[in-house]
């Protein structure tokens, strides 16, 4: 049976992650309160941030920026929008 969490991002019960997706206390908080669906949404947003801001993940400052954005996305006021991104029209 799948583990469920009360997802703070979706505001409902949903299937939880199988393991903490990030090291340390932040990873534990995410594992305890973020669903698989919300994590997948974050990964898409993170990819847009990396691409639009041309982040080099070998740079410690870029990794720190993404960690702050991840924490803001789940537990704060939201992550930065990807600058230059134009959503496709329907």
Swiss-Prot record:
Keywords: Iron. Pfam families: Iron_traffic. SUPFAM superfamilies: YggX-like (SSF111148). One of its GO terms (molecular function) is iron ion binding. GO terms for biological process: cellular response to oxidative stress. The keyword Methyltransferase does not apply. One of its GO terms (cellular component) is cytosol. The keyword Iron applies. Could be a mediator in iron transactions between iron acquisition and iron-requiring processes, such as synthesis and/or repair of Fe-S clusters in biosynthetic enzymes. Belongs to the Fe(2+)-trafficking protein family. HAMAP family: Fe_traffic_YggX. This is Probable Fe(2+)-trafficking protein. It comes from Albidiferax ferrireducens (strain ATCC BAA-621 / DSM 15236 / T118).
């Amino acid at each position: 049976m799948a583990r469920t969490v009360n997802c703070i991002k979706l505001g409902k019960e949903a299937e939880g992650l199988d393991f903490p997706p990030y090291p340390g206390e932040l990873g534990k908080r995410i594992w305890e309160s973020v669903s698989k669906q919300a994590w997948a949404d974050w990964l898409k947003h993170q990819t847009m941030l990396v691409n639009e801001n041309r982040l080099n993940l070998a740079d410690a400052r870029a990794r720190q920026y993404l960690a702050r954005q991840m924490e803001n996305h789940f537990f704060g006021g939201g992550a930065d929008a990807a600058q230059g991104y134009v959503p496709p029209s329907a």
